[in-house]
């Protein structure tokens, strides 16, 4: 099999290895949130969002988002409030406990980001980010959902 036929496999394995490592590092530091929960809490840090918007930004289905938010709510890290703009929906908001958890997790996440970059030049990192953004753009249905890798 030519090496370029393994790109999907390599991307999938890299993502799986990275998430496994991040989860291990978070747990080792005593943080009880998962990488997926951290993603939601990062988004909620600045403002509340609806389930639909969280799903769209994180590129996961609504049922997965609901499960994540349910667990965050059960842990006291987030809560639902009525959406003043649309009474049929709720805004998910971070709690003070959630802010403390994500602030603590951020230290570990930053450390893992540094681990990813170690051994690569700034130029290589920039090229890598451009490639990842290009792959994302190529396969998304619309650019309104795009979250650039910065």
Which ranges hold each PLM region?
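N-terminal helix-turn-helix DNA-binding core of bacterial DNA-binding proteins
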Residues: 20-64
């Amino acid at each position: 099999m030519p090496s370029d036929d393994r790109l999907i496999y390599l991307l999938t394995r890299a993502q799986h290895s990275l998430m496994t490592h991040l989860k291990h590092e978070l747990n080792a530091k005593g943080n009880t949130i998962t990488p997926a929960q951290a993603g939601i809490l990062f988004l909620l840090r600045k403002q509340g969002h609806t389930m639909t918007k969280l799903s769209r930004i994180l590129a996961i289905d609504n049922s997965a988002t609901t499960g994540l938010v349910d667990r965050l709510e059960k842990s006291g890290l987030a809560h639902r409030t009525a959406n003043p703009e649309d009474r049929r929906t709720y805004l998910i908001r971070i709690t003070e406990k959630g802010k403390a958890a994500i602030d603590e997790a951020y230290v570990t996440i930053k450390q893992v980001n540094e681990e990813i970059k170690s051994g690569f030049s700034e130029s290589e990192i920039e090229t890598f980010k451009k490639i990842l953004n290009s792959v994302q753009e190529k396969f998304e249905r619309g650019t309104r959902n795009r979250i650039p890798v910065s």
